[in-house]
């Protein structure tokens, strides 16, 4: 796009120019970590955030008892960058190991009916192979992936030698001899990545599994942590440490870059100039920003086609411990509109349930997003009450979040489709002029929050000229 054309998108009148060494777009973990590193090295850094808060896809629901998470649920003891940052800024960490046994106890719901675990091996819908009939459906898939994962290192998913595995989960499972009925049971039910097994790369899931295994191999006695006050406390602490206050409500609409300078235009008319720009926003958001000169080739295809996981979360406070009436666990793994229900245990005693969270992913999130928020909440609660009559009138909805409907994320974690890793995996983080890219979707060796931190570190080193 020519300079005159890019100028045409500037709101009128353009406000006073703001000059920095580096402008970071997005105040999530990756952007704030990059800003922190660069400020430590003496750079003048300005962070722009379109939302009303910092944290990005780390979202603590502070209106709910115990501050449960709608994004960035917990993190392992091997998340070195995240833990070091929390300790640097005196964010207290809470060991979640005591609650893990409670989390592992889930009720299984098939065809709108709770199936006692003792009855699962002989259930007519149990299509697991002989010798595996007792395994919980979702855990069977993880077992199969672990037993067949060829990746010897977490970054090996980007090695061309493994690109033959950049096929759909469905195709790979069929090649292992599994029928459609089994794939629907162990993968498509409460799907964690994508909308179906047909739209997700198996190579990506080998990466996910390799990362989980690498964390386990570290041998820590602690299962994981959350932060006091919610995990959002960590990005908030990073933001508070910055010399320049994070600029909220700054929706970037255009970036132009030259050999040694860049200009950033916001929807409110403000204009920022810097030698370097760091874009930490998801590609689903980045593709709506006008960039001049235009990005072309595989990187442009990545920006336009890499998707993010559809995920909704409903937080509910129980008016009474209804699970004590029916003698079942409050946790449920269902094939109903209730999705996956998790009891949050944020009190001093792990036996105390402070709230319940319904995880609503993939096609279920799609269905709910077509409803009004009130109707979506009502349909989920109605589903829970149908499955658990003891829960009737016992659930108070207190927070609901759709990541796809959030205009600053349009989904949660990145989803690599079949063939996309081979096609443009090596190009997603390539600098474009003075524009650099980070975010969980550009991480190579780590997942989740640590992946975001990895990418923030990498992009800061790019700006510093170290890599």
Stretches found by the model and what they are:
Residues 6-10, 261-263, 310, 325-467:
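Conserved flavin/dinucleotide-binding core of flavoenzymes
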Residues 20-47:
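N-terminal Rossmann-like FAD-binding beta1-loop-alpha1 element of flavoenzymes
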Residues 25, 48, 252, 271-285:
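Short hydrophobic core segments
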Residues 39-62:
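Glycine-rich FAD pyrophosphate-binding loop
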Residues 87, 94-198:
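Mobile amphipathic helical/loop "lid" adjacent to a hydrophobic cofactor/ligand pocket
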Residues 149-251, 258-261, 415-416:
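Active-site/ligand-binding neighborhood in enzyme catalytic cores
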Residues 256-271:
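Conserved beta-strand-loop-beta-strand element in the redox core of flavoprotein oxidoreductases
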Residues 279-297:
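Flavin (primarily FAD) binding-site architecture
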